[in-house]
Design a protein with these regions (language model features):
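C-terminal motif of bacterial Sec signal peptides marking the signal peptidase cleavage site
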Residues: 3-6
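Residues within mature, well-folded domains
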Residues: 8-112
Length: 112
């Protein structure tokens, strides 16, 4: 008798995907095009887009930390964002993501 169990979304599956993505990220280079990143990394788990001051900022988020056995959902900390501006890779990582959004969305207050 052979039993087959699906593992999509399981801790084993997310762990394998995270490990693969981390290994692929070692080959990322600033200035790569979206198509080059897509060829290296595959499709992102999810994306975010922002239009700020005429700039098209896009973040591709890749799973880089697997889900624990008792975790039912994935958290932001499970993903590493890759930042693109006008289809060119600017940088990656959670700190880069948070700093880029904070800088780009900074409210400018005029002096009186």
């Amino acid at each position: 008798m052979i039993l087959l169990f699906g593992c999509a979304g399981s801790p084993v599956r997310t762990g394998w995907e995270a490990e693969t993505n981390r290994a692929n990220m070692l080959n990322l280079k600033i200035g790569m095009s979206k198509s080059q990143v897509l060829a290296l990394m595959g499709s992102p788990y999810k994306t975010e887009s922002y239009q700020i001051d005429g700039k098209n900022l896009e973040f591709w988020l890749y799973l880089t930390e697997g889900r624990g056995i008792y975790d039912r959902t994935l958290r932001d900390s499970n993903f590493t964002p890759l930042a693109f501006e006008n289809d060119v890779l600017l940088g990656w990582g959670r700190n880069y993501y948070e700093n880029k959004l904070r800088i780009e969305q900074d409210i400018k207050i005029e002096k009186r």
